[in-house]
């Protein structure tokens, strides 16, 4: 059992039949009362983020999550297909579970697949990925007063705002958490 007082980001646990990973945890003590713990946690089955409240002495069941390194092969209308490069086994994951992640996946991208007792929960991407710009409108001359941005399209068809100097065929670094421009790749 895990004491909720020991919550910190990255800890996985089971509660009410769901599997969560702690994103943030705050501890507060009120006068003579017991300490309270509020945890911002992501439900690994649904992808939803919720705030859970516990009293100081509560304990939760740990969830032992297995992570497997896999390569993205391709996707169709309903699934994505991944291959384990160590034994060449393939798995499929429902496209709805990885909708956001698809914005950053290109062929042969390496991902971590999170599994709980042979149930595939989701995939974990690196914090940042390098993607090629496939469409970028020309910079408008004279529009340089207040950090001008323009919308570009990446090789995965994801659109985001970038600085004006980004051109077609440039490779840029994108945050997989926020979907924002991080910098230009070297």
UniProtKB/Swiss-Prot annotation:
| SUPFAM superfamilies to which the protein is assigned, alphabetical | Nucleic acid-binding proteins, Translation proteins SH3-like domain
Main location class: cytoplasm
Compartment(s) of residence: Cytoplasm
Q: Does the keyword Transmembrane apply?
A: no
What InterPro entries does UniProt report for this protein, alphabetically?
Elong-fact-P_C (IPR015365), NA-bd_OB-fold (IPR012340), Rib_uL2_dom2 (IPR014722), Transl_elong_fac_P/YeiP (IPR020599), Transl_elong_KOW-like (IPR013185), Transl_elong_P/YeiP_cen (IPR001059), Transl_elongation_fac_P (IPR011768), Translation_prot_SH3-like_sf (IPR008991)
Write out the pathway annotation from the protein's UniProt entry: Protein biosynthesis; polypeptide chain elongation
The protein's matches in SMART domains, at most eight in alphabetical order, are given as:
EFP, Elong-fact-P_C
Q: Please name one Pfam family that this protein belongs to.
A: EFP
Q: Name one GO molecular function term.
A: translation elongation factor activity
* Disulfide bond entries: none
Lineage top rank: taxon: Bacteria
User: Which GO CC terms are listed, alphabetically?
Assistant: cytoplasm
Q: Which UniProt keywords apply?
A: Cytoplasm, Elongation factor, Protein biosynthesis
The UniProt entry's GO biological process terms, in alphabetical order, are: peptide biosynthetic process
By sequence similarity, the record places it as follows: Belongs to the elongation factor P family.
NCBIfam families according to UniProt: efp, PRK00529.1
Protein function? Involved in peptide bond synthesis. Stimulates efficient translation and peptide-bond synthesis on native or reconstituted 70S ribosomes in vitro. Probably functions indirectly by altering the affinity of the ribosome for aminoacyl-tRNA, thus increasing their reactivity as acceptors for peptidyl transferase.
Protein name per the record: Elongation factor P
Q: Give the organism's phylogenetic lineage.
A: Bacteria, Bacillati, Mycoplasmatota, Mycoplasmoidales, Metamycoplasmataceae
